[in-house]
Amino acid sequence: MTDFRTLDDAGPLQGKRVLLRVDLNVPMEGGRVTDATRIERVVPTIREIAEAGGRVILLAHFGRPKGKPEPKDSLKPILPTLSEKLGRPVAFGEDCVGEAAAKAVAALKDGDVLLLENTRYHAGEEKNAPEFAQALAANGDLYVNEAFSAAHRAHASTEGLARLLPAYAGRLMQAELDALTKGLEAPARPVIAIVGGAKVSTKIDLLENLVAKVDMLVIGGGMANTFLHAQGKDVGKSLCEKDLAETAQRILAAAKEKNCTIILPADALVAREFKANAENETVTVDAVPSDAMILDVGASSIATIDGAIDEARTLVWNGPLGAFELTPFDTGTVAVAQHAARRTRAGQLVSVAGGGDTVAALNHAGVGEDFSYVSTAGGAFLEWLEGKELPGVEALRAKA
């Protein structure tokens, strides 16, 4: 993934109109930003371009306005937080193309920052319509993509635009691509992957790709129950996709063929109620009571996973090992996350994690800052793990 151009290749930025595609899809409540993480992560690139004398023109989507203006999906309420985090005023353009955009861009001086309105206010964005991409390109001299989280979508502002102007990866995109290369494309071996979450059905492609690429695969969360069921074990009232038993067996057979060691829970924390601090007990997976649910991995399984991490040099993690939102069913996820963080801090492990629940789980364990890289890109991270090409990245690669 090193064959893409970055800001280092862009030459002098003084006086250049830089169309910078960012991810500003932040949670809002009552017209205020409730979590500014995504804004904070793009600030360094905005600042770098502005300080080099570039005229920064921010392109972003927000919500799902279905190709026409929706007041609730306007980017305008983000302005105060963006200005505050950036430490400089940010102008606003009432549209991302046409006369309103052209006027706002024409008013810029070197080092100024402008946020244009939601790209999804136009149907051409999600259709990747050439004429819409050209209308966006009319306001820029070069294009920088900083939105890895939208890179799995071939939209006008992520893919079409990159074909029309000199295109570069922003610093956040660059960090993400470097981390992903270390994670799966050119990893230090052995590689261990941890895949959790509720359903096998949403992660079939992911599991099938990983068994061919990693040396050890830990399967946890609700999806592990489907594998245990496929092995003939009674999982009681646990979440289980019984209709996917054959799929699970196929994945287990593929792993065997590829010499990938599958690690499934040997014991589990079970309860009869799905609530915090429900009465619980640890049992082996051969002895799950018929009226109980598996809600976390047990102590023996935690020790096995920790031991496997000790053997590995690279870890890729997607999805929690149990119902981590409820105490004490967060024990497995927290213990394993903290163990991986210790190995990472000691320089013995490269750890890459991603996906919404995964980020929340690592933060819950207090180790969000300790992994080598934590991706905030849900869908794009998953599609990369599935081995799929990401149009937004390929468009940068094609220019190299």
Curated annotation (Swiss-Prot):
- Pfam families recorded for this chain? PGK (PF00162)
Assembly and partners? Monomer.
The name of this protein is: Phosphoglycerate kinase
Q: Which GO terms describe its cellular component?
A: cytosol
InterPro entries in UniProt: Phosphoglycerate_kinase (IPR001576), Phosphoglycerate_kinase_CS (IPR015911), Phosphoglycerate_kinase_N (IPR015824), Phosphoglycerate_kinase_sf (IPR036043)
Q: Which PANTHER family match?
A: PHOSPHOGLYCERATE KINASE, PHOSPHOGLYCERATE KINASE 1, CHLOROPLASTIC-RELATED
Which reaction is catalysed here? (2R)-3-phosphoglycerate + ATP = (2R)-3-phospho-glyceroyl phosphate + ADP
EC numbers listed for it are 2.7.2.3
Residues binding substrate, per UniProt? D23, L24, N25, R38, H61, F62, G63, R64, R120, R153
Give the keywords, sorted. Answer: ATP-binding, Cytoplasm, Glycolysis, Kinase, Nucleotide-binding, Transferase
Subcellular localization: Cytoplasm
Which GO biological-process labels does this protein carry?
A: gluconeogenesis; glycolytic process
Classify the main location.
cytoplasm
What EC class does the entry list?
transferase
Q: Which PROSITE patterns match?
A: PGLYCERATE_KINASE
**Which family, according to the similarity comment?**
Belongs to the phosphoglycerate kinase family.
* Pathway membership, UniProt: Carbohydrate degradation; glycolysis; pyruvate from D-glyceraldehyde 3-phosphate: step 2/5
Residues the record lists as binding ATP: K203, E325, G355, G356, D357, T358
Molecular function terms from GO: ADP binding; ATP binding; phosphoglycerate kinase activity
> Can you tell me where the transmembrane regions are?
none
